[in-house]
Design a protein with these regions (language model features):
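Bacterial N-terminal signal peptides that target proteins for export
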Residues: 2-15
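Bacterial N-terminal signal peptides
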Residues: 13-23
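Beta-strand-enriched cores of mature, soluble protein domains
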Residues: 29-175
Length: 175
C-alpha cells in the first residue's frame, strides 16, 4: 500500500505543479509590478554595552553586543528600547561583519514590539555597499499591526551625539 501511495505522489506532484504554473501563466505574463519605493517609518537610537568576545568559531570571530536601551520615533510611533536585547556579530574572513540583533521596543502607549534586525557591514571599498539592514517586527494586532505586514530596510550608522556607544538606525517601509 505504501509503495502505491508513493507511486501516486511521484506522478501527481508534477501534474499538480504543472497545472498551477499553467493557471498562473496569464497573471505572470502581465506587466511586472513597479520597483519598490521607500517611505520613512521611524528612527532608533540604540545604546550599546561593552562587547563580550566569544572568540573564533568555524564561521568567523563572534562577539555579542548588549543592547542597553535607547529611543525611537517616527510618524505615529514613539517610545523606548527595552534594555536586555543583544546584537550577535560575526566577523567574517572577508572583513565584513554580519549583524543580527534581537530586542524589544515599548511604545509610549505601552505596546511591546519585538525587532529582529540583520545585515552586513563591510569595509569601504570597491564593491562594498553602505550598511543596510533588513528588519522583521512582531507586534500585537491593532494600532501597530502594520509592522507585521511590511518589509523594512534600515540604514545604520554611529550615533554621533549619544552620551555613550550607540547606533542610529533609520527604518524605511518598502512600498
Amino acid at each position: 500500500m505504501k509503495n502505491e501511495i508513493r507511486a501516486v505522489r511521484r506522478v501527481a506532484a508534477p501534474l499538480i505543479a504543472g497545472s498551477l504554473m499553467a493557471a498562473s501563466a496569464p497573471a505572470l505574463a502581465q506587466d511586472s509590478p513597479p520597483p519598490p519605493k521607500l517611505e520613512f517609518a521611524f528612527e532608533e537610537i540604540v545604546t550599546l554595552g561593552q562587547a563580550i568576545p566569544v572568540g573564533k568559531t568555524p564561521l568567523g570571530t563572534r562577539n555579542i553586543i548588549p543592547i542597553t536601551g535607547g529611543t525611537f520615533e517616527g510618524p505615529g510611533i514613539k517610545g523606548t528600547i527595552i534594555p536586555g536585547g543583544w546584537d550577535w556579530q560575526l566577523q567574517r574572513s572577508d572583513g565584513c561583519t554580519h549583524i543580527k540583533a534581537d530586542y524589544m521596543l515599548r511604545t509610549d502607549d505601552g505596546v511591546v514590539i519585538n525587532v529582529i534586525n540583520a545585515g552586513a557591514l563591510c569595509p569601504p571599498g570597491e564593491g562594498s555597499a553602505p550598511p543596510r539592514t533588513q528588519a522583521v517586527f512582531e507586534a500585537p494586532e491593532g494600532k501597530y499591526g502594520w509592522l507585521n505586514r511590511t518589509a523594512f530596510i534600515g540604514t545604520l550608522e554611529l550615533a554621533a551625539n549619544a552620551p555613550g556607544p550607540a547606533v542610529r538606525i533609520r527604518f524605511y517601509k518598502a512600498m
